[in-house]
Swiss-Prot record:
It comes from the Bacteria. Gene3D superfamilies: Methylpurine-DNA glycosylase (MPG). Belongs to the DNA glycosylase MPG family. This is Putative 3-methyladenine DNA glycosylase. It holds the Pfam family Pur_DNA_glyco. Keywords: DNA damage, DNA repair, Hydrolase. SUPFAM superfamilies: FMT C-terminal domain-like. It comes from Granulibacter bethesdensis (strain ATCC BAA-1260 / CGDNIH1). It is an enzyme of class 3 (hydrolase). Its EC number is 3.2.2.-.
Length: 211
């Protein structure tokens, strides 16, 4: 990843200019199939959820607070928060206006498997990064990474990686674990992936071009 000044929205060799300032739903869809590494551990993103400032389910809906401050920061930076006081959740700040983010819900683990298994315990590969809490534990993501740029270490985000699954076939449906806007189909995932955290019953199927 090339170095990026803190004063500008980040870009990388795998993420074109303007990628992070588009509508959050487009970004959430396009992140599916990309490779995310944290200190060399990670894999292919197979599930995401989009949230924006006008979304009643979003942390930013009621405005800026100490907890959600990173959501109002620069696009292409991390927003990490603790869910239910138990586990960390990793989001990427994005969107055309402040207050948007995409939650990374699940990965197909491919790199640094031994280190991730040590963090998570001796479990089967399918459950290593299936769900936002498990994902953060496996990758070693904590609130110490909140606000960091995705353009520099420990993060590395790269273009699509072949997993042997139908990565171009993406499903969209309602998000998981929320109490507002529960019917909004802003969850995106690889339709055939066994590493997806929630139900694979979709509202509709789209491809990488959004068709």
């Amino acid at each position: 990843m090339k170095d990026c000044p803190d004063s500008l929205p980040v870009t990388s060799t795998g993420v074109p200019d303007g990628f992070w300032t588009r509508p959050v739903t487009e970004i959430a869809r396009d992140l599916v199939g990309m490779t995310l590494l944290v200190d060399g551990c990670g894999g292919v993103i197979v599930e995401t959820e989009a949230y924006d400032r006008d979304d009643p389910a979003s942390h930013s809906f009621s405005g800026l607070t100490r907890r959600n401050a990173s959501m109002f920061g620069l696009p292409g930076h991390a927003y990490v928060y603790r869910s239910y006081g138990i586990h960390w959740c990793f989001n990427i700040v994005c969107g055309p206006v402040p207050g948007g983010a995409v939650l990374i819900r699940a990965l197909h683990p491919m790199f640094g498997l031994e280190a991730m298994q040590l963090r998570r315990g001796a479990i089967r590969l399918r459950d290593l990064c299936r769900g936002p809490g498990r994902l953060c534990q496996a990758l070693g993501i904590t609130d110490g990474m909140d606000g960091l740029s995705l353009c520099r270490p420990p993060f590395d985000l790269q273009p699509c990686h072949k997993t042997g699954e139908a990565s171009d076939l993406i499903a969209a449906g309602p998000r998981i674990g929320i109490t507002r806007a529960i019917e909004t189909p802003w969850r995106f995932y690889q339709a055939e992936s066994v590493f997806v955290s929630g139900s694979r019953s979709s509202r509709f199927l789209i491809n990488k071009a959004g068709k």
